[in-house]
Regions:
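N-terminal beta-alpha lobe that positions the nucleotide/phosphoryl donor
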Residues: 1-149
Length: 149
């Protein structure tokens, strides 16, 4: 569950399981979980952006527009849209400053998408049930205004 609670870790795990993901700086990487169910540090680190120049290289590879995101961000903090290199270079220090110490990654912006959330409960026997979903697409500055269930 710890891996699924992290934006980079969950994307890396989904990609490893052949689940479709948006193009991102970690395309093509795989994760081999350790005996505790965690992604080894070196594999996680390979999926992170470590410099402004690395962010620009990744954006040029996947194509603009992109979202630069702090893995530990939330509530509109640590997320910036960049339509071109100049915006990305401006966004990089802002994202780092809003969520100090957080790993950072970059993902292709999906225009016109909906933000849907589903609550799932599972037990130790492999049983799981979806409790329902909600549309959280109405946002202001990347922060949910209301959730429609």
């Amino acid at each position: 569950m710890r891996v699924l609670g992290d934006k980079i870790g969950s994307t890396l795990l989904a990609q490893t399981a052949d689940v479709s993901t948006m193009p991102w700086n970690g395309d093509g990487l795989t994760a081999n979980l350790d005996e505790n169910g965690n992604i080894p540090e070196e594999q996680f680190d390979a999926a992170c952006i470590h410099s402004e120049d690395e962010a620009v290289e990744a954006a040029e590879r996947i194509g603009y527009p992109v979202m630069l995101k702090a893995s530990e961000g939330g509530g509109g903090k640590g997320i910036r849209k960049a339509l071109d290199e100049a915006e990305l270079r401006t966004a990089y220090p802002q994202v780092l400053g809003e969520v100090p110490g957080s790993p950072v990654f970059l993902v292709k912006l999906c225009v016109g998408a909906r933000h849907l959330e589903v609550q799932v409960v599972g037990d130790t026997h492999g049983n799981a049930i979806a409790l329902g979903g909600r549309d959280c697409s109405t946002q202001r500055r990347f922060q949910k205004i209301f959730e429609e269930g």
